[in-house]
Amino acid sequence: MTALTLSTAGAATLRADALVVGVAKGVKGPVLAPGSEAVDKAFDGKLAAVLATLGATGAEGELTKLPAASGLKAPVVVAVGLGPVPDKEDAYDAEALRRAAGTAARALTGSKKAGFALPAASVEDAAAVAEGALLGAYAFTAYQGGENKLAPKDAKSKGNGPKLPLAEVALLGAKPRDKAYKAAVERSLALVEEINRARDLVNTPPNDLYPESFAAVATAAGKEHGVKVQVLDEKALVKGGFGGILGVGQGASRGPRLVKLAYTHPKAEKTLALVGKGITYDSGGISLKPAGHNETMKCDMAGAAAVFAAVVTAARLGLKVNVTGWLALAENMPSGNATRPGDVLRMYSGKTVEVLNTDAEGRLVLADALTRASEEKPDAIVDVATLTGAMVLALGNRTFGVMANDDAFRTSLHEIAEEVGEPSWPMPLPADLRKGMDSPTADIANMGERMGGGLVAGLFLKEFVGEGIAWAHLDIAGPAFHEGAPYGYTPKGGTGSAVRTLVRLAERTAAGDLG
């Protein structure tokens, strides 16, 4: 992963491949952001005018490269847009800083070192720039650049491999010896490392990432970071009566798993349970998805990846809260052994579910995990899942839905998500939609009314949450996997959606700010 340093050098004297400065969109043209003073001085105070001549406006996402002035050690200056000049002087939005830093880091792929002279006068600004740059520098290259066995044996394979991400981010303008700055940057580094691990998991092809191999990754990470890991294999799931997880996974040749991760702090007063949907490949099962809808279904375990990353991050940060993660892992495949539409499953809770559509499988594995998590009486449960296409239709590709059995908890999660830069929107759980899941055969069906499908799924999950436990459901079907061109710090492919929200929730819980 990209290295991060708090540089003691100034922008003018830093030896790097490039210097990054921020430019805001002013009424009369581009306006240089704080942090760019030394670079502007090297241009005799005319950097903004030069950028305007080159067509730069300071709009968000805009990037302009130009040769550095003679007074700078770095050969290139990268000016990145921050959007409109803030109403309050120097009060740049943290998300604007993240996105700008990410845009610059992506543009500097292949470089060894870049100095980031973006606004970093406050601890919060420095952390935002660090996060954005590290997230933007991410690249998934595990399956690229291998040996070409068709090439002549004496040929040298130059330039065949992928360009490596920016190797080092040197943060300028921060205070390297200040404990608060150092702590904030160390937090950013730990957080981004785990977000990128979640991205790697989402991007890994399903022939290599399946329930057993995912469980192995979790086990190894647990040993490294002091997280207890328990893996229930197929035999243990049968013995325990986990009918939902087993029912979804029974059509696959590779069996399902339920993984429990437990981080505990000796002085913790609260326990937070996180539950993640981990369908490592979703074909739809017997209710097979149509052509054109299968290619990205390796991402259907993004909820489990987010939960895994959040628990490990909490452990790495030493948060004073107990955090338990439950990864409900299965492949949803058609076969002679697969669950059929019309089958009835007996869930871990004891309830029976009539399966009307085997492509509504995520709620089945989550239901078992929610019941199991509820048995431990946590103070709150949050589940995360790429659950419904209906949520994507409602909110688009960049916003996740937040549902809950407690309005205050739903509001808190929405506000936390917005605070950390993850767009979200509170969604209702209308009681009148519950009747659509009535079954003449079982206690409940796994499908209901077509309209409001995302809300129906939330109502289904609510049935499996223990009494008196605050619960929220994050449907990340839209933002979990980005199929378009990269933007800001968001890459193509797995995004690590919801990790930042879950970690901030754990921090708030540890601080006693929630409940």
Swiss-Prot record:
Catalytic reaction list: Release of an N-terminal amino acid, Xaa-|-Yaa-, in which Xaa is preferably Leu, but may be other amino acids including Pro although not Arg or Lys, and Yaa may be Pro. Amino acid amides and methyl esters are also readily hydrolyzed, but rates on arylamides are exceedingly low; Release of an N-terminal amino acid, preferentially leucine, but not glutamic or aspartic acids
Enzyme class, UniProt record, top EC level: hydrolase
One Gene Ontology CC term in the entry: cytoplasm
Compartments where located: Cytoplasm
List of catalytic residues: 289, 363
Any one biological process term the GO annotation gives: proteolysis
Broad class of where this protein is predominantly found: cytoplasm
GO MF term list: manganese ion binding; metalloaminopeptidase activity
The protein's required cofactors: Mn(2+)
Domain of life: Bacteria
InterPro entries: Leucine_aapep/pepB, Macro_dom-like, Peptidase_M17_C, Peptidase_M17_leu_NH2_pept, Peptidase_M17_N
Binding residues annotated for Mn(2+) 1, in chain numbering: 282, 359, 361
Protein function: Presumably involved in the processing and regular turnover of intracellular proteins. Catalyzes the removal of unsubstituted N-terminal amino acids from various peptides.
Membership in a protein family: Belongs to the peptidase M17 family.
Protein name: Probable cytosol aminopeptidase
Gene: pepA
